Amino acid sequence: MRRRRAAVAAGFCASFLLGSVLNVLFAPGSEPPRPGQSPEPSPAPGPGRRGGRGELARQIRARYEEVQRYSRGGPGPGAGRPERRRLMDLAPGGPGLPRPRPPWARPLSDGAPGWPPAPGPGSPGPGPRLGCAALRNVSGAQYMGSGYTKAVYRVRLPGGAAVALKAVDFSGHDLGSCVREFGVRRGCYRLAAHKLLKEMVLLERLRHPNVLQLYGYCYQDSEDIPDTLTTITELGAPVEMIQLLQTSWEDRFRICLSLGRLLHHLAHSPLGSVTLLDFRPRQFVLVDGELKVTDLDDARVEETPCAGSTDCILEFPARNFTLPCSAQGWCEGMNEKRNLYNAYRFFFTYLLPHSAPPSLRPLLDSIVNATGELAWGVDETLAQLEKVLHLYRSGQYLQNSTASSSTEYQCIPDSTIPQEDYRCWPSYHHGSCLLSVFNLAEAVDVCESHAQCRAFVVTNQTTWTGRQLVFFKTGWSQVVPDPNKTTYVKASG
């Protein structure tokens, strides 16, 4: 496997450096015909394949229509927009109905998606718009991972910026199972690529600080498949739960707060309430400490239709919930509730309570319990998470919890203690005790609570909440000058 990935990455770089087309092993994508070009006839499926070409065409049409639904509602008509043109050309023609050659039939240029909504309040502006030209001299191609449909690679652009490339995985489950069933490589390629196209549309329509930024896309011919699609996105780090459990509570809370804000946005998105049918940690990435959803090809906007509450059972491995059926014939809040319970079982229950400040634990426990019982919706959940942030950032959580110390500490400005470290948990540094504090009184309180602490060094570095980072030490036998730090040592003991 390691050898295969190395070979894939090597070929990927070589294809770009030579200025040739993207290699299908690394940047596969959709197989829409070029504008004005009729779809090529596919070979008839082999014997025993159920449904045949008609069934495959039905599935392609269903996915195409789904992408069309999500792409509607932009700021203007699709005419003149390159991605909209490409999408229109993807429409499979009906039996015996030839598709007319459009007047703008010519090779399309690459660029940004053609239907970006105006950014709403708090939404990030559009990122740099990249296309095929940006990918011709990339370096450092590295395989990051793959799922059922897509493979992800990390590359460095000529300007030095690192981005992620997503493309249909030729070795993936979706493409392989389709080819085994229908025996039609290009048709199956198109079917799989519509999931990537759907994700591209949703990344643009759902723009938010906790949705991965779409930077652009590229269509290029690749081997025997014309117009393969590669999307170019913001680069994030995979979510590794075991590693997160070893980080500070402040960083873990930031992830949960990010998730709460994301779920609130999905519940009130321009498309309606969006649910993530595949809600595992691997569907998310971390970008500068913020959690962002990256995999949207299994997202769904439509609520579940119902005739009664028996049709509105939300099933999970550990338990089920029955939701009401509205008078309009839809399960009330099923999309929102599914997201919320998944946030509880994959994130909140592990990351929120452990090693939190004692005065915040009752509120954190109530958040975990309420989401685990689906007693709250996303609005109330986010309001409570924002309350925790306010209490923590303002220092109000310290009221009645920081005892006045009888021990005096001597201040030594512009100095530090280079050694005499000890380990504590959780710490921002694995080899020492590096914690964040709201003020000097909290630093003294922490030192007093550690039996081995005899001194601490206040740095000029702060966390995302504005709290200062402090090293706690076992002694002060060697104090050296440092203009960016201040040392405090116990006056006795």
Curated annotation (Swiss-Prot):
Region listing for Disordered, in residue ranges: 28-128
Residue positions with a glycan: 137, 320, 369, 400, 460, 484
Subcellular localization(s) per the UniProt record: Secreted; Golgi apparatus
Mod. after translation: N-glycosylated. Phosphorylated on tyrosines; probably via autophosphorylation.
Compositional bias ranges of the Pro residues kind: 30-46, 95-105, 114-127
Catalytic reactions of this protein: L-tyrosyl-[protein] + ATP = O-phospho-L-tyrosyl-[protein] + ADP + H(+)
Assigned keywords, A-Z: ATP-binding, Developmental protein, Differentiation, Disease variant, Glycoprotein, Golgi apparatus, Kinase, Nucleotide-binding, Osteogenesis, Phosphoprotein, Protein transport, Secreted, Signal, Transferase, Transport, Tyrosine-protein kinase
GO molecular function, one term: ATP binding
GO biological process: bone mineralization; cell differentiation; embryonic digestive tract development; limb morphogenesis; lung alveolus development; multicellular organism growth; negative regulation of Golgi to plasma membrane protein transport; peptidyl-tyrosine phosphorylation
InterPro entries recorded: FAM69_kinase_dom, Kinase-like_dom_sf, PKDCC, Prot_kinase_dom
Protein kinase domain segment(s): 138-493
Gene3D superfamilies (alphabetical): Transferase(Phosphotransferase) domain 1
Any Pfam family matching the protein: PIP49_C
Tissue: Highly expressed in platelets.
Active site, UniProt feature: 278 (proton acceptor)
Coiled-coil regions listed in the entry: none
Disease: Rhizomelic limb shortening with dysmorphic features: An autosomal recessive skeletal dysplasia characterized by rhizomelic shortening of limbs as well as variable dysmorphic features, including macrocephaly, short neck, micrognathia, mild proptosis, downslanting palpebral fissures, depressed or broad nasal bridge and long philtrum.
Family: Belongs to the protein kinase superfamily.
Main function: Secreted tyrosine-protein kinase that mediates phosphorylation of extracellular proteins and endogenous proteins in the secretory pathway, which is essential for patterning at organogenesis stages. Mediates phosphorylation of MMP1, MMP13, MMP14, MMP19 and ERP29. Probably plays a role in platelets: rapidly and quantitatively secreted from platelets in response to stimulation of platelet degranulation. May also have serine/threonine protein kinase activity. Required for longitudinal bone growth through regulation of chondrocyte differentiation.
Protein name (Swiss-Prot/TrEMBL): Extracellular tyrosine-protein kinase PKDCC
The organism's taxonomic lineage, starting at the top: Eukaryota, Metazoa, Chordata, Craniata, Vertebrata
Gene name tied to this protein: PKDCC
